[in-house]
Each structure stands twice: as structure tokens, then as C-alpha cells.
Design a protein with these regions (language model features):
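N-terminal active-site segment of His-dependent metallophosphoesterases
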Residues: 20-81, 159
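His/acidic metal-ligating clusters that form di-metal
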Residues: 56-63, 131, 141-210
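Short loop/turn segments that connect beta-strands within beta-propeller blades
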Residues: 329-333, 369-372, 409-413, 450-454, ...
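Active-site environment of divalent metal-dependent phosphoester hydrolases
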Residues: 39-42, 72-78, 99-107, 138-141, ...
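Extracytoplasmic beta-rich repeat domains
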Residues: 288-310, 337-352, 375-392, 401, ...
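Binuclear metal-dependent phosphoesterase catalytic core
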Residues: 202, 209-276
Length: 626
């Protein structure tokens, strides 16, 4: 009898022990959906719907992660629609934005945060901390750049917890400040990274940090699906779940890894760049200094910058993406005043007769007293105003996201005329002269309006139907009765300024970046693949084409002329100077981030170049002494 009792209690003990072990070994189970690319009328809608229904059919998930690119074009309507679909999930979900949600955002990246309620998250489940943030690039075509606000947030997080980081992009050279990101992630205690962007499954490692990139929910002529992640105390598995009609299948894990703390093994130079940094480094500045290039001053803003300058006499004005307009001294860069507004600012301000004009994502066009920063007048649009204004003959010409191009009185903001039939939103600075107003939109179209009454003169449309191929980011230039524009189909188009007729196309010479010489005789354009081309504006022949040595580059920033120099900006914080015959003279690095529109002028002290980069760096160069 005692033997029976002993056997019984041993059995009970083993049973309870096994239950305890099982409880400890029960993993977190997470559904990860990424790259949804919601677009009304496309197959993406049914793909998302099927994935959401399937997630809801699973009985044992802990929560859902959404990895960005939830929309195809970042419109307000797309964001609202996909939010409605995701809200039908029966599990809690946490979301980050992707480049498609940010780059083509008609709201200036405001709507995503307003609709979903946050731009980053931080929560803990079963001993694991999950953090996620947006990746950029905000509004400008470039590699990803975690915004300064996101970097400040990462820097504020305390370490000491096992952490999983969720971001749309791989944290490699796809992200301009990748080395700052991974350094912070290691400090925090990150052990695993989850992302998307590539639309397919990949095992990754970022300076010792393990991670995965996962498939898109899109069927892509195959089957929709998503990812199941299981996370134990020190181990992770990643599996694809594919939806075959009414028969979903979760495949065996394609990724399995033990997770542990990762120490930083990277070495950094005095400028904070890692030893493996693959692009132009700051040592080019030493070479340029020997050729008479001097950095007069340089400082770091506490926010990103995604627009250019207005400058007059001894002052310059610029805006940050956090919504602050600043006035600084050109002598030493010291701040004279700053004012903060109700939305992000991507508009390059314009100065005229003591008035500073710019657009804001809060939907207003503002005119300030340039000396003091006080508001003289403001005019409301029904959506964000991301475009840059031009002033001519006491009138302000500016596009917006609400389908209306406006001409306003500089003095009081009263409406002179409106053109209310614009398709797509406007982000560019228009070309304006006494004959026409020319601007592009994110609906494949380029418009020419009469500057006196706003009547339509002509519309040109890109032959490629995707709205990604729009003449919208380029700042058009004009010479010899011709309009020159660059389109993301990698072509430079030359149009008759009077009729809009296409006169010539230069293939594979550019993406969105053009410029023009001071005398108007030469048009410059920059390709994605390290070439700079000079075109005779009258004869439409190529004068020269040179290798730039800058590698892959997708910056939309206009090429500038500084005296007899051609200044080519890049998306990696560098400028490269050429003479007017195409000879490379020198280069300068300001930061790792995209160079914004530049301002140049000559004085008795020499030629000057005012530059900012997207990470908030602002600097003034003097090129020679006279």
C-alpha cells in the first residue's frame, strides 16, 4: 500500500512539474504583418482583408505587430481606410510607419500619427520589451533616416531589459544613420530586430544584432500571407503563414536562433562614423580646405530639416520639420529669433520686402515680419501646405495638398486668384515669370498657368501611369523658351514653354534633380548612378557628362551654381564641386544625411554657400577669399 501511495505521489509530482516546465516554456506568439500597401481598387485590399480574418481565426496569439508601408502612397484616405481594416483585428496591434507612408504623404507625415495615435511605442510582455518607431525619409526621396525625434526617443530609453526592436527598414546601410541606431539599440539591451521593406524573408545581422525581414501581406501573383514569431526566454523562431484559398498553412520555421546580449564591437572615428562606413568621410574636408574652402560656422538643430533657406543681407531663415521657423545671423550662425507653428514644415521660405512667407502642414500659408517673427497674416487651405512659395510683383504663388494653386497678395494675403482643379498634391517650388507659372504634382502632371489670372495654359502628363512617376519633387527651370523637368522614370524632359509639347527626352540622365547656370545657357541634371550631365539649353545637345564618384544617389535636391562652380548635392550629406567644363574640384561632407536646397551668394568677402542637411545640420561655407 505504501508503495502504491509513493508511486501515486511521484506521478502527481512529475505531472505538476511537467505543467510548470510547460508554462515556463510557453512562448510569446506574435503575428507580424508588413508592407500591406493599401491602395483602393487594388488586390492589396483583399489581401489585407484575408490576412486580418486569418489572424482573427488563430486562438493563441498574444498580439500583432505591423511593420510599416501600410499604405501605397500615404494619402489621408488610405491611412484612414487601412486603420479601419486593422481595427477589426481581435488582438491588440502595434504599428510603425514605412517609407511609403512618409515619403509621399500629402499631410507632411502628420496624418499617420494623428490617426494611429502615436509615432513610436514601448511595452513589455512576458519579460520582453518591444519598442518601435518610424523610419523616414520624411517627404524627401533618400535612403531611410530615423528622424531626430525618434533618435532622441531611443536615447531617452533606459537599458537593462531584453528588447525587440521593430522598424520598417533593415538597420544596415539602407538607413543613413544606421550606426547611431544600432549603437543605441545595444545600449538599451536589444537582442532581436524585426522589419520588412524587402517584401521577402531574410535573415539579417547588424553589427552583431540578429534580425529578420519578413514577407509582405501582398499576394504578388502568388498567395497572401504574413509571419508568425514565437519568442521564448532566450530563443526565437520565425515562420511564414501562407493563405491558400480556404486552407492556410504555417510552414516550419525558416529562422531559429538563440538570443543573448550583444556588446558593441564597432569602432568610431572622431566624427562618430563607424570603421565600416561605406560612403564619403569627413577627411574630404581637409582636402577642400587646402583649396581655399572654409567652414565659417556650423551647428546642429534639435529637429530634422527638410527644406532650404531664405537669405537677405546679414540674415537667413529656415524651418524645421517640427514646425519651428528660425532666423540666424549669417556672420556667426547665432539665433536671432524662432517661432513654432502648429504643424511640420517642409516648405522653403521666401523673403521679400521684409516679409517671410512659407507653408505649413497645419494647413496655413504664413507671412511673418522677417525681422521679429511675428505673424502679419495667414491664409487657410483645407489640407497641408507642403509646397514652397515664390514671390513676384508683390504676389505669392504657392501650391498645396487640397487641389488648389493660389496666388495671394504679399501685403495682406488676400486672394488674387485660385486655380482649383489641380490633381494630386504639390510639394515643389514653382517656376514663375511674367509669362507662366509651372509646377508638378503627384498625379503624373505638370501644369502651366497664366500668372495674371490663373487660367490654365497647358497640362503635360508623364506617359507612365504610376503616380510614382510624377514631375512633383523637381523644381522646374526654364531657358530659351523651354521648360526642363526631371521625372523618377530617370528621364530629363524638355517641353515647349508655350504649348507644353514634349521636344526632347534624355534617358537615364537624372531622377528628380536639375539645375541651371546663372546665364541660363546650361541645364544640369544628376542621375541615380553617379553621373552629372550638362546640356546646352538652346541646342539641346549634351556638353559633357562626368562620373561623380558618389555612387547610388536618389536625392531630389536641385543642383546649384556658385559663381563658376557647379555644386552637386547628394543624399548622404556631401556636396561635390565641378567647374563649368565638368572637372571635379573638391567635395565637402556636412553630415550623413540628405543635403537640402542650398543658397549661394557673392560678396566682397568671397563666394558663400549656405547648406543644411535633413538631420538638422546647418553650415556656411566660404569658397575662396574674393
Amino acid at each position: 500500500m505504501d508503495r502504491i501511495k509513493t508511486t501515486f505521489f511521484i506521478a502527481i509530482f512529475l505531472s505538476l512539474a511537467s505543467v510548470g516546465v510547460f508554462a515556463q516554456e510557453t512562448p510569446l506568439k506574435i503575428a507580424f504583418l508588413t508592407d500591406l500597401h493599401y491602395s483602393e481598387g487594388s488586390v492589396s485590399v483583399s489581401d489585407i482583408s484575408r490576412c486580418v480574418r486569418d489572424v482573427n481565426s488563430l486562438p493563441d496569439l498574444d498580439f500583432v505587430l505591423i511593420g510599416g508601408d501600410v499604405t501605397d502612397f500615404g494619402t489621408d484616405e488610405e491611412i484612414e481606410a487601412v486603420k479601419s481594416m486593422l481595427d477589426s483585428l481581435r488582438y491588440s496591434y502595434y504599428i510603425v510607419a514605412g517609407n511609403h507612408d512618409a515619403k509621399w504623404s500629402e499631410s507632411g507625415c502628420d496624418t499617420f500619427g494623428k490617426v494611429f495615435g502615436y509615432d513610436h511605442f514601448d511595452f513589455t510582455r512576458k519579460g520582453w520589451r518591444f519598442i518601435g518607431c518610424n523610419c523616414g525619409p520624411d517627404m524627401r526621396m533618400a535612403p531611410a533616416l530615423l528622424p531626430k525625434e525618434s533618435m532622441d526617443w531611443l536615447g531617452s530609453l533606459e537599458g537593462g531589459q531584453k528588447t525587440v526592436f521593430i522598424n520598417h527598414y533593415p538597420q544596415d546601410t539602407s538607413v543613413l544613420n544606421y550606426f547611431d541606431v544600432t549603437r543605441e539599440l545595444k545600449r538599451i539591451g536589444t537582442r532581436f530586430l524585426i522589419g520588412g521593406h524587402w517584401h521577402s524573408n531574410h535573415a539579417m545581422e547588424y553589427d552583431g544584432l540578429p534580425g529578420v525581414l519578413c514577407r509582405s501581406t501582398l499576394s504578388a501573383r502568388k498567395n497572401p500571407g504574413y509571419t508568425i514569431i514565437k519568442l521564448w526566454d532566450d530563443h526565437v523562431t520565425v515562420s511564414e503563414r501562407r493563405l491558400y484559398g480556404s486552407t492556410p498553412i504555417t510552414f516550419e520555421p525558416w529562422y531559429s536562433k538563440d538570443l543573448k546580449a550583444v556588446e558593441s564591437g564597432e569602432e568610431y572615428d572622431s566624427e562618430g562614423l563607424p570603421s565600416g562606413y561605406p560612403w564619403m568621410r569627413y577627411d574630404v574636408n581637409e582636402d577642400a580646405s587646402m583649396k581655399g574652402i572654409t567652414q565659417v560656422w556650423k551647428f546642429q538643430e534639435d529637429s530634422n530639416i527638410a527644406s532650404g533657406f531664405a537669405a537677405w543681407k546679414d540674415k537667413a531663415w529656415y524651418a524645421t520639420t517640427s514646425g519651428t521657423v528660425c532666423c540666424v545671423s549669417l556672420k556667426d550662425g547665432s539665433r536671432i529669433w524662432s517661432e513654432t507653428f502648429g504643424g511640420r514644415i517642409f516648405s522653403t521660405p521666401v523673403y521679400c520686402d521684409g516679409i517671410l512667407v512659407f507653408g505649413c502642414a497645419d494647413g496655413f500659408i504664413y507671412a511673418l515680419d522677417a525681422k521679429r517673427g511675428s505673424v502679419i497674416w495667414c491664409r487657410k487651405a483645407s489640407k497641408s501646405v507642403l509646397a514652397s512659395p515664390v514671390v513676384m510683383d508683390g504676389k505669392v504663388f504657392v501650391g498645396s495638398s487640397d487641389g488648389i494653386f493660389r496666388c495671394l497678395s504679399l501685403k495682406d494675403g488676400d486672394t488674387v486668384w485660385e486655380y482649383p482643379q489641380v490633381e494630386g498634391f504639390v510639394e515643389c517650388r514653382p517656376y514663375v515669370d511674367e509669362d507662366q507659372v509651372v509646377f508638378g504634382t503627384w498625379a503624373n502632371k505638370l501644369y502651366s498657368l497664366d500668372p495674371d489670372d490663373g487660367s490654365l495654359q497647358w497640362v503635360w502628363k508623364c506617359a507612365k501611369t504610376s503616380r510614382m512617376y510624377s514631375p512633383a519633387a523637381v523644381w522646374p527651370v526654364k531657358s530659351h523658351g523651354k521648360i526642363f523637368i526631371a521625372v523618377p522614370d530617370r528621364c530629363l524632359y524638355v517641353l515647349d514653354a508655350v504649348t507644353g509639347e514634349e521636344l526632347k527626352r534624355f534617358d537615364k540622365t537624372c531622377r528628380e534633380s536639375v539645375g541651371i547656370s546663372p546665364d541660363g545657357e546650361t541645364v544640369y541634371c544628376k542621375s541615380m548612378w553617379h553621373t552629372l550631365t550638362a546640356i546646352d539649353a538652346k541646342s539641346l545637345t549634351i556638353k559633357w557628362q562626368v562620373e561623380t564618384g558618389t555612387g547610388y544617389d536618389i536625392s531630389p535636391t536641385s543642383i546649384a551654381s556658385a559663381g563658376d562652380l557647379v555644386i552637386m548635392p547628394t543624399d548622404k550629406g556631401n556636396i561635390v564641386a565641378f567647374d563649368t567644363f565638368g572637372s571635379k574640384l573638391w567635395a565637402w561632407k556636412f553630415s550623413p544625411a540628405l543635403v537640402n536646397p542650398m543658397t549661394t551668394w557673392r560678396s566682397s568677402e568671397g563666394q558663400f554657400l549656405l547648406v543644411s542637411t535633413m538631420d538638422g545640420t546647418v553650415a556656411l561655407l566660404r569658397i575662396g577669399n574674393n
